[in-house]
Amino acid sequence: MSWQAYVDEHLMCEIEGHHLASAAILGHGGTVWAQSADFPQFKPEEITGIMKDFDEPGHLAPTGMFVAAAKYMVIQGEPGAVTRGKKGAGGITIKKTGQALVVGIYDEPMTPGQCNMVVERLGDYLMKQGL
């Protein structure tokens, strides 16, 4: 299966009648492996900050997490594995695997729990595949 198929079929899938606003799979250095059509472009320093938060949980909490210059308030996650952010009626979930970052961005009416489920399920699958 291609990386694009993972995004199209597993991240942008319908969940209880709703879809993510955008999604992508990136390498740890920020290289885009596959993305939805309207996924925002990360700046290199944003990826650096996110990766540092995985290595040093809580690093982004004081400043927030930035994605394409949009600021997300960092909310609960799983240290070293999942970072979550909230911005208005939407938010973001990022799951770190051995080689990739699985990213989902949502807006209402999709819920944070639905976004978490979609992103983390694919991330867990990729980890089991050694990725």
From Swiss-Prot:
The keyword Cytoplasm applies. Its main location: cytoplasm. Keywords: Actin-binding, Allergen, Cytoplasm, Cytoskeleton, Disulfide bond, Phosphoprotein. Occurs in many kinds of cells as a complex with monomeric actin in a 1:1 ratio. Transmembrane segments: none annotated. It comes from the Eukaryota. One of its GO terms (cellular component) is cell cortex. Binds to actin and affects the structure of the cytoskeleton. At high concentrations, profilin prevents the polymerization of actin, whereas it enhances it at low concentrations. Phosphorylated by MAP kinases. The variability of the residues taking part of IgE-binding epitopes might be responsible of the difference in cross-reactivity among olive pollen cultivars, and between distantly related pollen species, leading to a variable range of allergy reactions among atopic patients. This is Profilin-6. The modification Phosphothreonine is found at T111. Belongs to the profilin family. Signal peptide: none annotated. One of its GO terms (molecular function) is actin monomer binding. It comes from Olea europaea (Common olive). The keyword Cytoplasm applies. CDD domains: PROF. It is found in: Cytoplasm, Cytoskeleton. A motif (Involved in PIP2 interaction) lies at residues 81-97. Pfam families: Profilin (PF00235).
